[in-house]
UniProtKB/Swiss-Prot annotation:
InterPro entries: Ribosomal_uS15 (IPR000589), Ribosomal_uS15_bac-type (IPR005290), uS15_NS1_RNA-bd_sf (IPR009068). Keywords: Ribonucleoprotein, Ribosomal protein, RNA-binding, rRNA-binding. PANTHER family: RIBOSOMAL PROTEIN S15, BACTERIAL AND ORGANELLAR, SMALL RIBOSOMAL SUBUNIT PROTEIN US15M. PROSITE patterns: RIBOSOMAL_S15. The keyword rRNA-binding applies. It comes from Brucella anthropi (strain ATCC 49188 / DSM 6882 / CCUG 24695 / JCM 21032 / LMG 3331 / NBRC 15819 / NCTC 12168 / Alc 37) (Ochrobactrum anthropi). SUPFAM superfamilies: S15/NS1 RNA-binding domain. One of the primary rRNA binding proteins, it binds directly to 16S rRNA where it helps nucleate assembly of the platform of the 30S subunit by binding and bridging several RNA helices of the 16S rRNA. This is Small ribosomal subunit protein uS15.
Length: 89
């Protein structure tokens, strides 16, 4: 199941660096993490859904690239972001 518009707006509001910020890497990583979590739950009941599994792998790769970008810009921002999201890296 995809994420609702209300949940996406809540994530944007929570992770935005300034008012109206929807494209910062922090916001993008937060939205991707929510989508990844939803797909992970989906796979608990649909183990053989290989088409969605490919989409999940693409999302994970995109999130990894964004996290690497943030890490290259500012190490403290990176550490704060993975701490807030509860990611292990």
């Amino acid at each position: 199941m995809s994420i609702t518009a209300e949940r996406k707006q809540a994530l944007i509001k929570e992770y935005a660096t300034k008012e109206g910020d929807t494209g910062s890497p922090e916001v993008q990583v937060a939205v991707l993490s929510e989508r990844i979590a939803n797909l992970t739950e989906h796979f608990k009941g649909h183990k053989n859904d290989n088409h969605s599994r490919r989409g999940l792998l693409k999302l994970v790769s995109q999130r990894r690239r964004l996290l690497d970008y943030v890490k290259g810009i500012d190490q403290t921002r990176y550490q704060a972001l993975i701490g807030r999201l509860g990611l292990r890296r």
